A protein has these predicted regions:
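Alpha-helical membrane-protein topology signature
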Residues: 1-183
């Protein structure tokens, strides 16, 4: 502890980045595990929905002999379609609803304007989700050829969590300034 206290006293800005970064990674990884657990049962909860292509823009792509629809948002029927998309989005939204207050209040210690922070966080979530999903639909199609669903779901949440974590750290640094709200 003495080393850390000395480091923090000599380099307060660096110590803040290390503390926030470390806590951010821990919280984000715990949320990622939680999302993975949700994806183990949520697709079954939507099994009664029709398994139809549900995505945009739905461009046909062939990789490793597997033809699938590339989507920025959603999945083709062969890779879960509407039921998987519903399960995936619910897992992501629940995870972020838990993540937001922990990151805001505990990790970044922000007291900023809550409504603005929620708005920016939701916007960032939507943009990041589109980026990640456009990569994830390729991952699911290719990984689905080689491994069972519980394995590619690990890849799905690690991909989602990893890319999201990197982007969200910098987004959160901006939208969650530490300290009291400016008047």
């Amino acid at each position: 502890m003495n080393f850390w206290n000395n480091f923090a006293a000599k380099h307060p800005a660096a110590a803040k980045w290390v503390r926030e970064g470390g806590l951010f990674v821990i919280v984000s990884n715990l949320i990622t595990v939680f999302k993975y657990l949700l994806l183990q049962f949520l697709p079954k909860a939507f099994a009664s929905l029709p398994v139809v292509d549900f995505g945009w823009p739905g461009i046909d792509i062939t990789l490793f002999g597997e033809t699938f629809k590339w989507n920025i948002l959603g999945y083709d029927a062969a890779h879960g379609g509407l039921p998987y998309f519903c399960a995936y989005m619910i897992a992501m939204v629940i995870g972020e609803c838990i993540n937001f207050p922990i990151q805001r209040n505990f990790v970044f210690r922000s007291k900023g304007n809550l409504a603005k922070q929620i708005g920016w966080y939701v916007l960032a979530f939507c943009v990041i989700t589109c980026i990640v999903n456009s990569i994830n639909c390729i991952w699911m199609a290719v990984a689905g050829l080689f491994v069972p669903a519980f394995i590619y779901n690990i890849g799905t949440v690690v991909l989602n969590g990893g890319i999201s974590m990197v982007i969200f750290f910098f987004v959160n640094k901006i939208i969650f300034p530490e300290g009291a709200q400016a008047k």
